């Protein structure tokens, strides 16, 4: 009976993950650095070197050195994912950061209404992020990220749909005197693409695609050469 229960639970978990993977803004949930992806993305309380503001914006308030990072992933089915990030401390107790994430699909064969081939096209999703964080106490910081979002979707050689919007992340980070760090983040608050199809389709309209909001709680244990991280997250 227990075996059947775990099999059913596993299937339901996979199906639920597939549903959320197809929601808007998936490129922001794929992971940027090899280290964070290899560790399951559980970096709410862990510093992702070179990309400190992606998982928890409050981390920028604890930076002591400038952080610059860039990555590019050539994915299957002609997909791409690229990111560039810069973050630095802002004396005496703050930190700032800016980042750009780009994703899309290349080598899309366009066709005319007759079926003949036209030009090659590509899609593009972009997020520009501005981060500010402040240490309230030496052991506690709060941070926020503003995201400017844009999605370019080609229809024909001359027609293109563009969706745009704004979203927010907030994060809290607490460091203990010993070996533990705790973090809380809420990602993609009010993030969305707003589309206007009136210029392309005769009966077009304005509508919004909302990103799922992610709530995370995480912890890190770091002592000498041992680092343990853990995250619990809920997607709504």
Spell out what each predicted region is:
Residues 1-4, 138:
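Positively charged n-region of N-terminal signal peptides that target proteins for export
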Residues 18-46, 65-68, 73, 80-236:
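Outer-membrane beta-barrel porins/channels
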Residues 12-15, 34, 60-63:
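N-terminal processing/targeting junctions
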Residues 51-62:
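N-terminal periplasmic accessory domains that precede
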Residues 4-13:
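Sec-dependent N-terminal signal peptides
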